């Protein structure tokens, strides 16, 4: 048994998280009250990864919901799937973190963290052999960013050999809630670089662009954005939840995707993109899906993969299709886009196929890319951080909670190091003995 315990922290984390549970409950044939209504044996075969079967026969998510204010919890609890979660697993404070990372990490969050760890411990005790944790949170606020990263460092101490995955929503200038987002995000990334094994970077800006450009939604709501995120999360976790051939657990995914321990920030993508409530009216072929997967417009992260190179890629196809066709299409796209893959990692594209399509679609595909272009996000946040930090703007909110300026300086330099590491591997060619090949490659490029 390889269970995963899911934690959702803060307002954003809880909204994305509860949407994720709606989607996967539906895929596994579990209704909002936790009763199995499905018809396929494969739906339950590996449902234990995310669901615990209670003595009453109900399926209960292995999820812990936390926030520093009661508001979000109330809306999850009163939502359609509110009664699905175990009532003891709602953990909330009263004061809120007020978008202040220091409050989430050092003061308010630190007071609540032991309670949360107890709840998580209980969840882990109900597992036979836990493979790891996944967390949904945003990096721009106080609770998800500050308290979320505090929890991650606590797990690292308590479960050092378990995989830690996060779905982290990056702040973006176009969709900004607060002026201190660059501070909160930089401090969070400083933690994530050291303490997580896999981080899926989800970017509100990219989600907005997809909603406006591709889905033609005139004014997208957070509900529309969360729909896109949940489709991607469902796709990324397909291999873990259904019998499939490859990347059947978090550790295998990490081994295939992370060539250097610090470079574990992935760009997710999804095809075909559909808006909420509209079923897909077009027939899709495997070649369509493959084309869309590698299209910059389908990335959930606001950076252009054509500005960098892929270190590794994993693609998960769902639906009735032949493995042979999938392999051929993936092979041809690799050849077509060979300059965008580093040549010093051979066979750096992994493909998995799962027979069960997502609800409402005939077939779909999910993309996970470890591309050096992700440095664009970090650069963007770093520039905004430096502009404010140079003037020491808003710093008193953080020092007032007991933080030191030194911590800001460290976080800033760690993020800049991360950017230069990505840049270094982007420019790296095969060893010098391959000079001849490189010349040939450049000549082709010039032609």
Swiss-Prot record:
Superkingdom classification of source: Eukaryota
Cofactor(s) needed: Mg(2+)
Cellular component, GO annotation: cytoplasm; microtubule
Described purpose of this protein according to its UniProt entry: Tubulin is the major constituent of microtubules, a cylinder consisting of laterally associated linear protofilaments composed of alpha- and beta-tubulin heterodimers. Microtubules grow by the addition of GTP-tubulin dimers to the microtubule end, where a stabilizing cap forms. Below the cap, tubulin dimers are in GDP-bound state, owing to GTPase activity of alpha-tubulin.
UniProt-annotated stretches for the region Disordered: 424-447
Gene Ontology molecular-function annotations: GTP binding; GTPase activity; metal ion binding; structural constituent of cytoskeleton
Name of the protein this chain belongs to: Tubulin beta chain
């Amino acid at each position: 048994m390889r269970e995963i315990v899911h934690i959702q922290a803060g307002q954003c984390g809880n909204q994305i998280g509860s949407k994720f549970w709606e989607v996967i409950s539906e895929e596994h044939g579990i209704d909002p009250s936790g009763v199995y209504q499905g018809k396929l044996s494969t739906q339950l075969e590996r449902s234990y990864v995310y669901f615990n079967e209670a003595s009453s026969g109900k399926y209960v998510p292995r999820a812990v919901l936390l926030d520093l204010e009661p508001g979000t919890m109330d809306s999850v609890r009163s939502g359609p799937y509110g009664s699905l979660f175990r009532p003891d697993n709602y953990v909330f404070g009263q004061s809120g973190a007020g978008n202040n990372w220091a409050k989430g990490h050092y003061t308010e969050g630190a007071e609540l963290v032991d309670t949360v760890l107890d709840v998580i411990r209980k969840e882990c005790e109900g597992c036979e052999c836990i493979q790891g944790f996944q967390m949904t949170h945003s990096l721009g606020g106080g609770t998800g960013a500050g308290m979320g990263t505090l929890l991650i460092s606590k797990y690292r101490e308590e479960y050092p050999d378990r995989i830690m995955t996060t779905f982290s929503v990056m702040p973006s200038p176009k969709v900004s809630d607060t002026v201190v987002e660059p501070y909160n995000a930089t401090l969070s990334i400083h933690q994530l670089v050291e303490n997580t094994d896999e981080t899926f970077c989800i970017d509100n800006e990219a989600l907005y662009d997809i909603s406006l450009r591709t889905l033609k939604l005139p004014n997208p709501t957070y509900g529309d954005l969360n729909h896109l995120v949940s489709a991607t999360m469902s796709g990324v976790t397909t291999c873990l939840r259904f019998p499939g051939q490859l990347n059947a657990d978090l550790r295998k995914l990490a081994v295939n995707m992370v060539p250097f321990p610090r470079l574990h920030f992935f760009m997710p993508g999804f095809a075909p993109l559909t808006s909420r409530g509209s079923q897909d009216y077009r027939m899709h072929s495997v070649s369509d899906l493959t084309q869309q997967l590698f299209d910059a417009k389908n990335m959930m992260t606001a950076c252009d993969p054509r500005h960098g190179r892929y270190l590794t890629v994993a693609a998960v196809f769902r639906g009735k299709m032949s493995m042979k066709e999938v392999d051929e299409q993936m092979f041809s796209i690799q050849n077509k886009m060979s300059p965008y893959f580093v040549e010093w990692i051979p066979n750096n594209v992994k493909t998995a196929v799962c027979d069960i399509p997502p609800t409402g679609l005939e077939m779909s595909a999910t993309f996970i890319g470890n591309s050096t272009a992700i440095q664009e996000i970090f650069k963007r946040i770093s520039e905004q951080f430096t502009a404010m930090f140079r003037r020491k703007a808003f710093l008193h909110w953080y020092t007032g909670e007991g933080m030191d300026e030194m911590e800001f300086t460290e976080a800033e330099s760690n993020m800049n190091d991360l950017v230069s590491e990505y840049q270094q591997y982007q420019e790296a060619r095969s060893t010098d003995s391959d000079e001849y090949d490189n010349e040939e490659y450049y000549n082709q490029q010039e032609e």
